[in-house]
Amino acid sequence: MVVFDLDDTLYKERDFLTSSFRVIAREAERRGILSYSKAMALLCGSGDGAGAFSTLAREIASRAPGCGMTEEWMVNTYRTHTPDVTLPQESEQLLEALKSKGVRMGLITDGRSNTQRAKIKALGLESFMEPRNILISGETGFDKNNREPFAMMMERNQDEKGFVYVGDNPAKDFVWPNALGWGTVQLDDTEGVNIHPQDMDRPASFLPRLHISSLPQLLAVDLPMI
């Protein structure tokens, strides 16, 4: 069974962030506070999400105090908006190939239930994996720093002979699947755009057993379930 991380593995998390930027910028323009292009320039030129929201909120407060478009409102919009994101071609290529081979797939992801569910729906991932094999920390109560989500996946799929986890973040993606005897594969951030830097200066127990630079490369790996 092949189990995936979601953010910065099956798609780039920056795309979700940019999607929220567009929603916020359109609202600023709709209210006549800032043009869409000006709002997007402020958001995209301010580093990470928190910095971007803070920058735009200050600008809006100076132009339209009390309008309600606060930093808190922007963070909530980021978390709850319907994302305009699509599954990258290489992700779709891999998922379709695994599906055609009859390989069972799953997802273990950290985040709020509504946020992650919105991403999963937008990316069309339900067509590749059973609902019982989509585990979200906001629903299970355990993130990937814990044994539980990986053990839960094994418990739900006792007929599987082996498990592989494909992720991007060595800080938490691989330590527990390694401990449970899974294969572990890191999708390397060759563009340097991931939300979490891939710091490999860690104990061996945290590191993946294999690195790939693109998801379709997984098809060339000698894994018993592929």
Question: Which residue ranges define each predicted feature?
Answer:
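Active-site neighborhood of HAD-like aspartate-dependent phosphohydrolases
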Residues: 1-38
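Hydrophobic "anchor" residues on beta-strands that sit immediately upstream
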Residues: 1-3, 106, 164, 210
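An amphipathic alpha-helix signature
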Residues: 17-26, 50-58, 113, 117
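A metal-dependent, Asp-based hydrolase signature
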Residues: 29, 34, 43-79, 97
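Acidic-and-aromatic substrate-binding clefts and catalytic sites of carbohydrate-active enzymes
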Residues: 45-49, 83-85, 142
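Asp-based, Mg2+/Mn2+-dependent phosphohydrolase catalytic module
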Residues: 96, 112-226
